Amino acid sequence: MNTPTRSILTLATVACLLAFNAPVQARDATLAARVDHVLATVPLIDGHNDLPWEIRDRFGSVDRFNFAADTATLPLPANAAEDVVPLMTDIPRLRRGHVGGQFWSVWIPTTVQGPAAIKMTLEQIDIVHNLVARYPADLQMAGSADDIVRAQQAGRIASLIGIEGGHQIDNSLPALRQMYALGARYMTLTHTSNTDWADAAT
């Protein structure tokens, strides 16, 4: 096959591929626009995020943590275990993911029991409140569906609180009521150990 013929065949093949690819790209752009529209209209709610514990464990307080930066690039603590992974949540990624509401987990280890569990849970709730207060242009506390809608209309990410185990209330309904008053909106019955009133099946 001579060079001009080969060039013509190559150009024809490229033209066919481009012509075939154009509808696919248009379809992808249309689909992406539809997804963006839905997520701008209906809040996407993430039901679990362990960031409050990571802030406590890695930084000690919200003041030492830059949530507006790419948290995957933040240095790990000097005493970090080898299997510690970079953080996966920050404001830029929440925005890119169109997250409209985030349940921040106020998990504590099941080895912490009794009054100490209540104290540590309150400290974790305080981390969430401090995080929201530090980034008021991006985050807003929410305790109801109406609060989530208001946060979305204001262009903020609704911040809700979830308790990750019944051990965190030390068998105390008054403690649970006070945690609710501070913003907690769910509590799992158990985490990885039994309570006096629920079996973790582990």
Task: Label each region the model flagged.
Residues 25-202:
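N-terminal hydrophobic targeting/anchoring segments and the immediately downstream early-domain regions
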